């Protein structure tokens, strides 16, 4: 009888160990959903080397795409990098897991001012961890723009792309823009002297008229290839993020093609935005998710990503590790005067979001 019990115990122990091993094997990956080309390439491999956990990376090129996928649920992702204005909707829908800061020892490195601003969309900083932040402006090929518009080209103004006499001439060398209703419609409203977060349908009609007037001169709407096309000369003006210009500059340096790419935040004002790491409530691997978020909070780790993509981060301890050419670039680490001209992305009522989406659809199709 003892032999039978011993045998049974041995079998059960073996089964238990096998089950535990299988469970651990299933837990040795973490799924990250991030913007296209928005993390230093060596970071996932470095994390795996240190922890044994493989990072499975999926990417998106618009906040609207990511939001739609997350709202459906069961995405299979653990950690997602998401724009601040989308946070309230995800929190309300119960998509996100409230963070246990005891599992994030490197939280202490975060900038208190950045955390304070984030509370507008995440009260108490309960769900989101600052990752990178940036602006939307105009990236352009200095020589090509001057050749077409002269030395006094209004590169410090939205007039460059919203006045037909300018954009019609620039279309000869190519004008492209982000594919983002949230950003472009808000910028158009602000340019017209209207509230960027307007809830008045008539204001959106005016923004639509402005955008449709310049639509024939826009070559394409795409958020993922504008930096490459700017650096190789396929386009000369891009309404895009500051990192668009930075990546184009890096590509030019590597290619040695002599192109001079610059970035401008128009004097009329533009968007400032923040990207944040969140842990999904239905994350398949929450333990590994916490480990990845905390790893990305290390100063040396997030500094590598800033140096790669050209965006500032919300990690105060990382600032000395950010390359000098970024730290001292006034288009990256902004002056108080420039910051005062910027406005944030905001969550709007669903009926207004639908109006904005319809406007953008009409602009893209030119109808």
From Swiss-Prot:
This protein's name: Putrescine/agmatine-binding protein
Gene Ontology terms for molecular function: polyamine binding
Protein location: Periplasm
Function: Binds putrescine and agmatine.
CDD domains per record: PBP2_PotF
Transmembrane segments: none
Keyword Disulfide bond: no
Organism: Pseudomonas aeruginosa (strain ATCC 15692 / DSM 22644 / CIP 104116 / JCM 14847 / LMG 12228 / 1C / PRS 101 / PAO1)
A GO term from the CC aspect: periplasmic space
Protein family per UniProt: Belongs to the bacterial solute-binding protein 1 family.
One Pfam family of this chain: SBP_bac_8
GO BP, sorted A to Z: polyamine transport
Gene3D superfamilies (UniProt xref): Periplasmic binding protein-like II
UniProt entry tagged with the keyword Transport: yes
Annotated keywords: Periplasm, Signal, Transport
Superkingdom assignment: Bacteria
